[in-house]
Amino acid sequence: MSTPEQEVEYRQHRFSPPPGATEIFLVRHGESAPAKGDNPFELVDGQADPDLAPEGRDHAERVGRRLADERISALYVTTLRRTPQTAAPLAAKLGLTPEVEPDLREIHLGEWENGLFRRYTYEGHPIVEQLWREQRWDVIPGAETMESFGGRIRAAIGRLAAANPDRRIAVFTHGGVIGEVFAQASAAKNRFAFLGADNGSISHLVVSGENWMVRRFNDTSHLQSPFG
């Protein structure tokens, strides 16, 4: 007597990176020191280079604990010291020396470097309103053009992906950079749609050739921050 053939089950697909793809955890640096008019930041190639604030060092420790078991093969930082300072706890846990990727440094804010962007944002400067209305950093006098910024970010991500096929890497970078990466990945019409990643947050991108896939944005669960 024949038995009924077992019914085939078709489960929902679970994502896995394509062969040769690179998983990139983009970590925004921890909170940096506050800007003070009578104590300007040091500059590196014309860009403000503040240390981490005490809160930022706590962010760095929490990031290190969160990512310590994520099979990360390489770490990258920028030329601005708040990124290697944020990477330091994870680097110590993994026994890895971070490599410097200069092109993932923050957008250059021209005449508004050295804390002036923070001040003018707080004061409600009319150019800040124009910046958000037009979705362009280069309305700020002397700022890097959007074309230059977007081009160097895309080139840098492409280089890191090409150097790390089938690997996971962590990139310690800046809020403007993360916003630009995810705007490009999603082809967002609003260029600032992903601006505002929190200090110490982790975002996750998968790069397979020219295809950039968004996996998560602004994960702060390790920071124990409520929604807000």
Where do the language-model regions lie?
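Acidic, low-complexity terminal tails and accessory targeting/binding regions
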Residues: 1-23, 66, 99, 107-119, ...
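Active-site-proximal alpha-helix that buttresses catalytic centers in soluble enzyme cores
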Residues: 2-25, 31-100
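Active-site metal-binding loops of divalent metal-dependent hydrolases
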Residues: 30, 175
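Phosphate-handling substructures
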Residues: 50-51, 94-154, 215-218, 227-228
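Generic structural signal for well-ordered alpha-helical scaffold segments
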Residues: 61-68, 150, 154-162, 182
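Short beta-strand scaffold positions
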Residues: 77-78, 151, 172-173
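Glycine-rich phosphate-binding loops at beta-strand->alpha-helix junctions
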Residues: 82, 177-180
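Active-site signature of alpha/beta-hydrolase-fold catalytic machinery across serine-
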Residues: 89, 180-184
